[in-house]
């Protein structure tokens, strides 16, 4: 059974991203601008609508806002598919970086989008029933008890299991092979769960730590914990999220080329290490 070299994969991902950062920016900045602008206005409206609904008790008015959020998620997945296909091709050596801009949507982008959508659907298929059970266990409100805490841990367990097995190889598979991506990812990643988890941690944890640190520095000190009911604490959290939204959006825009470059190359490296058999052309 093939094994993914953890340290070498992480190292090569950082070397690739540092050496090709300008090209990565050229490949993704157009869809990244669209994602950032749409995300800012979508979340701004979402926070305002939820805050108003909690203050007035009229949660039924959140329908249009939730539909808008759903539309944003679909659009963001489409645009991320455009970005990842281009950068994965750069990591594979099948494309050169353009001088200043790129935007395309073809068969590979469509396959990447479907793979992202399928992964999201897979997560929701496990998470939604857990949330429904948790809500019923707490009577739809009140203070969460040990049962709810256990369900939250179960959700984290599902996420930790799914990401290395299904997501780690997804970008490379969607571009390099014409196969059902999630099924192929599950097959190839067998026996490499901890290695893939270590690679993902080595890529995302440092970047997200830096992003969180910059958010604290630029956004000022976090307010003291709010005493009172769960609703008051949630309201305070929403107000804080709304106030820091410009900073979060800006930081996300600037750090995205690094994260996409790191993840794309790590996915390609892991796929190359695990691909010990010829590509099978299976129509999804």
Enumerate the language-model features and the residues they cover.
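Selective recognition of hydrophobic, aromatic-rich stretches within alpha-helical transmembrane segments
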Residues: 63-96, 142-178, 240-278
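Alpha-helical transmembrane segments and their membrane-interface junctions
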Residues: 120-139, 204-222
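Low-complexity, intrinsically disordered extramembrane tails and loops of integral membrane proteins
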Residues: 1-3, 96, 100-101, 183, ...
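Short, membrane-exposed interhelical loops at transmembrane-helix boundaries
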Residues: 58-60, 187, 226-248
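Alpha-helical transmembrane segments in multi-pass membrane proteins
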Residues: 37-81
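Nonpolar helix-loop interface/hinge motif
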Residues: 1-47, 155-227
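Interfacial transmembrane-helix boundary/kink motif in multi-pass membrane proteins
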Residues: 24, 96-121, 184
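Residue-level signature of the transmembrane alpha-helical core
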Residues: 28-29, 33, 70, 74, ...
């Amino acid at each position: 059974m093939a094994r993914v070299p953890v340290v070498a994969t992480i190292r090569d991902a950082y070397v690739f991203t540092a050496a090709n950062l300008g090209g990565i920016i050229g490949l993704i900045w157009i869809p990244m601008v669209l994602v950032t602008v749409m995300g800012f206005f979508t979340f701004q409206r979402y926070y305002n609508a939820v805050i108003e609904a909690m203050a007035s008790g009229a949660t039924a008015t959140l329908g249009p806002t939730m539909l808008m959020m759903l539309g944003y998620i679909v659009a963001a997945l489409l645009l991320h598919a455009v970005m990842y296909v281009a950068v994965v091709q750069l990591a594979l050596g099948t494309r050169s970086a353009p001088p200043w801009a790129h935007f395309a949507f073809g068969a590979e982008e469509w396959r990447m989008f479907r793979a992202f959508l399928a992964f999201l659907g897979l997560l929701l298929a496990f998470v939604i029933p857990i949330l429904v059970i948790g809500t019923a266990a707490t009577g739809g409100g009140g203070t969460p008890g040990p049962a709810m805490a256990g369900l939250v841990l179960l959700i984290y367990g599902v996420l930790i299991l799914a990401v290395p097995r299904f997501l780690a190889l997804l970008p490379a598979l969607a571009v390099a092979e014409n196969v059902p991506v999630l099924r192929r990812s599950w097959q190839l990643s067998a026996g490499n769960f901890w290695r893939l988890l270590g690679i993902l941690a080595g890529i995302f944890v440092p970047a997200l730590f830096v992003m969180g640190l910059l958010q604290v520095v630029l956004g000022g000190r976090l307010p003291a914990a709010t005493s009172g009911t769960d609703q008051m604490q949630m309201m305070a959290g929403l107000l804080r999220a709304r106030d820091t939204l410009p900073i979060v959006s800006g930081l996300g825009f600037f750090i995205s080329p690094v994260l996409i470059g790191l993840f794309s190359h790590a996915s390609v490296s892991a796929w190359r290490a695990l691909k010990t058999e010829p590509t099978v052309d299976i129509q999804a």
